[in-house]
């Protein structure tokens, strides 16, 4: 029987009225590595941020695993230089007999030794993406691929905050939110904060802070953070070099040493050091929708 044929067990109401979540088997807990889950509005640059952060951790000498949790499976392509097959694709090829898989079938080495996995997802409108993430972690555990890893980064689909795509929060120590200095991005961040706060009642995950990405200024992000008790822990400016790195299928650490590129690399290294050394667990108070409109100057 396919591991995806069985409906995932769910718990209702444990972290908010009407909440439905995928239950984590304690044996699937990731131990020994620091685990980060990256969220943000769709199209905000989570994959770019995750990949460059993975590269930065590797530059610090850490053994890194990045897990893409989006059916688009493009999370790791700047690390590997290609769109690698997903765990779900590989399982389909062996009729979901996971015991037939070898690590090299679904784990691919990227820039500076970063290990890359794309979980993939079920067809649109079917299945549970969170369950797919669980099966991916299960495979990694079965093949002992997490034992020699210092850092695990989950790059999570868009700003979806359902129980299924909150599944990486079950494994994460800290959640990081990628945002920009505009209303839509901050609005999405506010919703993600509410979701993480709800899940943290049952899981050990806590918020680490936010990254202002593709933003010349950070005034709106900083104003929001000050209001709710959150922290901006990095600022990645809106550089054409970042866009070009995506087109070249490379991380920023492989681009030419232009002054602006060097500065952004330093910011990623600083972010990696901050996360590795540990951040204070944050408990911001998300705002009602109307208050966000008022805060950011909308009538």
Swiss-Prot record:
NCBIfam families: DPOR_bchL. It comes from Dinoroseobacter shibae (strain DSM 16493 / NCIMB 14021 / DFL 12). This is Light-independent protochlorophyllide reductase iron-sulfur ATP-binding protein. Pfam families: Fer4_NifH. One of its GO terms (biological process) is light-independent bacteriochlorophyll biosynthetic process. One of its GO terms (molecular function) is metal ion binding. Component of the dark-operative protochlorophyllide reductase (DPOR) that uses Mg-ATP and reduced ferredoxin to reduce ring D of protochlorophyllide (Pchlide) to form chlorophyllide a (Chlide). This reaction is light-independent. The L component serves as a unique electron donor to the NB-component of the complex, and binds Mg-ATP. Pathway: Porphyrin-containing compound metabolism; bacteriochlorophyll biosynthesis (light-independent). ATP binds at residues 43-48, 72, 213-214, 237-239. Homodimer. Protochlorophyllide reductase is composed of three subunits; BchL, BchN and BchB. [4Fe-4S] cluster binds at residues 128, 162. PANTHER family: LIGHT-INDEPENDENT PROTOCHLOROPHYLLIDE REDUCTASE IRON-SULFUR ATP-BINDING PROTEIN (PTHR42864:SF2).
């Amino acid at each position: 029987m396919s591991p995806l044929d069985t409906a995932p067990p769910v718990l209702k109401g444990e972290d908010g009225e009407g909440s439905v979540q995928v239950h984590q088997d304690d044996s699937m807990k990731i131990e020994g590595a620091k685990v980060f889950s990256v969220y943000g509005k769709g199209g905000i640059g989570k994959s770019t941020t995750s990949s460059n952060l993975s590269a930065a951790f590797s530059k610090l000498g850490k053994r890194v695993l990045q897990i893409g949790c989006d059916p688009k499976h493009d999370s790791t392509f700047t690390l590997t230089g290609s769109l690698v097959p997903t765990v779900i694709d590989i399982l389909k090829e062996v009729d979901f007999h996971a015991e037939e898989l070898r690590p090299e079938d679904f784990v691919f080495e990227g820039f500076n030794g970063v290990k890359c996995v794309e979980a993939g997802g079920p067809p649109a409108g079917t299945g549970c993406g969170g369950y797919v993430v669980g099966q991916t972690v299960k495979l990694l555990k079965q093949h002992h691929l997490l034992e020699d890893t210092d850092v695990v980064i989950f790059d999570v689909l868009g700003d979806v905050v359902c129980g299924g795509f909150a599944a990486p929060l079950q494994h994460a120590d800290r959640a990081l939110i990628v945002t920009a200095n505009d209303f839509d991005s901050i609005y999405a961040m506010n919703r993600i904060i509410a979701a993480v706060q709800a899940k943290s009642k049952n899981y050990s995950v806590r918020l680490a802070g936010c990254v202002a990405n593709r933003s010349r200024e950070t005034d709106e992000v900083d104003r929001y953070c000050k209001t709710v008790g959150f922290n901006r822990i990095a600022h990645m400016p809106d550089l054409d070099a970042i866009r070009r790195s995506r087109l070249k299928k490379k991380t920023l650490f492989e681009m030419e040493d232009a002054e602006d590129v060097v500065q952004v690399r330093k910011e990623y290294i600083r972010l990696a050091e901050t996360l590795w050394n540990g951040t204070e667990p944050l408990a911001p108070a998300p705002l009602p929708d109307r208050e966000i409109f008022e805060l950011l100057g909308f009538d």
